Amino acid sequence: MDIVDMIASSCTNIARGELQQFNHIGDLTTTPEDYYSIIDGKTVGPFATGTAAAALVAGASEEVSEMMYEFGTEFGRAFQLVDDLLDLTGDPEMGKPRGTDVHEGKMTLPLIHALTILHGSEREHLADVLSNFSDDRWNELTSLLELSGSFSYTRQLIQNHVDRALDILSKLPPSDACLLYTSPSPRDRG
């Protein structure tokens, strides 16, 4: 596939993902599969397309471009999950105000997970909090997300996607760019 076709396909998928997300606003029956379909179109697709197209522009083979597409997919999913967590835990001073997605009724994976895990009165409580959300219900929401293990579940998924992305990079043919990947980062130096 050439770069123009890749970008055109990505743009189509962004629009499809946005429409899917709109159809799931406030939908407490949204599944993890629905969630991934939404983010794969509107967030992940641009990451995957960008990394694959960059590989082709740099003269990489079709095989390497496909690997970079898979890398971008995993990286984009990790990015979106981090964004979901920051929406629930963010600090405006860090540039991410808390609660934008919740106020808009967007069903993020931590919310979907909690709705799946909680049962009985706890699930009913969460459904009420989400359906009638206001800033004075933050403590209720975060308590229910903690109770369901949704924060730790999402953090584990982020780590899984990062690990898969790094595994893909480790399988790329040797190159100068790979030296950057294998060099220790300042964070790793202690």
Which role does the model predict for each range below?
Residues M1-S183:
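All-alpha prenyltransferase/terpene-synthase fold signal
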Residues P184-G190:
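Single conserved hydrophobic/aromatic residue that forms the stacking wall/gate
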